[in-house]
Regions:
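Protein kinase-like catalytic core scaffold
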Residues: 60, 102, 126, 229, ...
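N-terminal amphipathic/basic-hydrophobic helices that include classical n-h-c signal peptides
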Residues: 1-14
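Juxta-kinase regulatory segment immediately upstream of eukaryotic protein kinase catalytic domains
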Residues: 13-36
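Active-site activation/catalytic loop segments of kinase-like enzymes and analogous catalytic loops
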Residues: 260, 264-307, 324-343
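Conserved ATP-binding subdomain of kinase catalytic cores across diverse folds
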Residues: 36-39, 43-184, 188, 263, ...
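All-alpha amphipathic helical-bundle segments outside canonical DNA-binding/catalytic cores
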Residues: 143, 310-322
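Activation of the activation-loop gatekeeper triad in protein kinase-fold domains
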Residues: 253-258
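ATP-dependent phospho-/nucleotidyl transfer catalytic cores
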Residues: 37-41, 63-74, 131-146, 161-232, ...
Length: 382
């Protein structure tokens, strides 16, 4: 790097530090900021570690909220405030003293003690306490799947008695009836001229045969037989913080999607990705199998934590949840393909069609495994 370019880079870093410092100062921070640096991959640089000088003060995480995905930032942060406050109260009641490592803590702004985000130049920022001596995991194996089941089940259990209603941060996110109506509308409009393709017609026929069964949750919900609960709605193994030695799950993170939903959102969506042997865009469908080891480990952990508050009908419908989410994702990928690939990024013209076919192949693998799935769940109830 030439001296001139090196100097320019240093100036840009100094300017960025100054801008970020001014954002941090909008929050009620009592510590002195030492440095601010990107946290995570650094590809987007929307998350920063705020290092403080004082040894008795925590470091912080400064994060920009993606208001394109979550346009109602106030609702997102209100939900998070309700959830984290309730978890903190439950942990205290259980005798937990190390709250810092077991629940996220967001700082209020200087101007408003009840507001947990600041608006700066049309962008929205929040500041939370950094949880040290913690790591995330990417690999899904039976051990991490069991930990995930326990953690997300415990998360739901702690929030089963939240006294106030949370908002829906992404409307109809896991509403199967809505997703099917979206697909029907895409077929009528046929924006990309793909409706008559043989592969599309074949997949539509197979999805249509299962549509009534896959919308059972919405029907039971309207009849008052199936409750909506506070769910995480983005259950992935990397949305948990583990202790450094990996022996303990400390905290569930990434709470932007926390909202009311059927419990299947957290149970089924985790298994959709974690229990498949192939990525969701793998074109060789022979590589797609349903991992019984991951399913059993996750289910065992989940029921150990969640069984105490689940209704008999919710438990009875857990097998339905396992097939629901790959089905839903197949519908959503096909919808995007028919609409001209405007939602998910694609690498080639039929990418979304392959994704839709891939997820439907997983549906078939789950259907084949259904007797074993039901038998294992029943074995955990005895």
């Amino acid at each position: 790097m030439s001296p001139d370019k090196s100097y320019e880079r240093k100036i840009k870093i100094i300017m960025l530090q100054s801008q970020l410092q001014s954002i941090v100062e909008k929050f009620a921070v009592s510590a002195t900021v030492s440095t601010i640096r990107p946290l995570g991959s650094g590809l987007i640089n929307d998350t920063y570690l705020v290092v403080t000088e004082e040894k008795d003060q925590p470091d912080y995480v400064l994060q920009r909220i993606n208001h394109e995905v979550f346009p109602d930032v106030d609702m997102v942060m209100r939900n998070i405030a309700i959830v984290t406050r309730h978890i903190r109260e439950r942990l205290i009641a259980q005798g937990e003293t190390d709250l810092r490592h077991h629940v996220l803590e967001f700082l209020p702004t200087v101007e408003d003690a009840n507001r947990l985000y600041a608006e700066v130049d049309g962008h929205y920022w929040r500041l939370m306490v950094f949880i040290d001596h913690a790591v995330t995991k990417q690999e899904v194996n039976p051990e991490s799947a069991h930990a995930a089941g326990q953690s997300f089940g415990h998360f739901q259990a702690m929030l089963a008695d939240v006294p106030c209603q949370l908002g829906e941060t992404i409307k109809d996110f896991h509403n199967m009836e809505f997703r099917i109506e979206q697909l029907k509308q895409a077929c009528v409009e046929d924006r990309a001229g793909r409706f008559d393709e043989p592969a599309v017609q074949e997949l539509l026929e197979q999805l249509g045969k299962r549509a009534e069964a896959m919308t059972e949750a919405e029907r039971l919900g309207r009849e008052g037989k199936l409750p909506k609960r506070v769910c995480h709605c983005d259950t992935k193994v990397n949305n948990m913080l583990f202790s450094e030695d990996g022996s303990e799950v400390l905290c569930v993170i990434d709470l932007d999607t926390v909202m009311p939903s059927f419990i299947f959102s957290d149970y089924g969506d985790f298994l959709r990705t974690a229990a498949s042997t192939a990525a969701e865009d793998e074109p060789d469908f022979s590589k797609i199998q349903f991992r019984q080891d991951v399913f059993q480990a996750f289910t065992k952990g989940y029921l150990a934590s969640a069984r105490s508050f689940l209704t008999p009908l919710e438990i009875q419908m857990l097998p339905y949840a396992v097939v629901l989410f790959p089905y839903m994702q197949s519908v959503r990928f096909l919808w995007d393909y028919l609409n001209g690939d405007g939602y998910w990024k694609v690498q080639y013209p039929t990418h979304n069609l392959v994704r839709a076919q891939n997820q439907f192949e997983l549906v078939k693998r789950v259907e084949e495994a259904m007797p074993a799935i039901k038998a294992f769940i029943n074995s955990q109830l005895n």
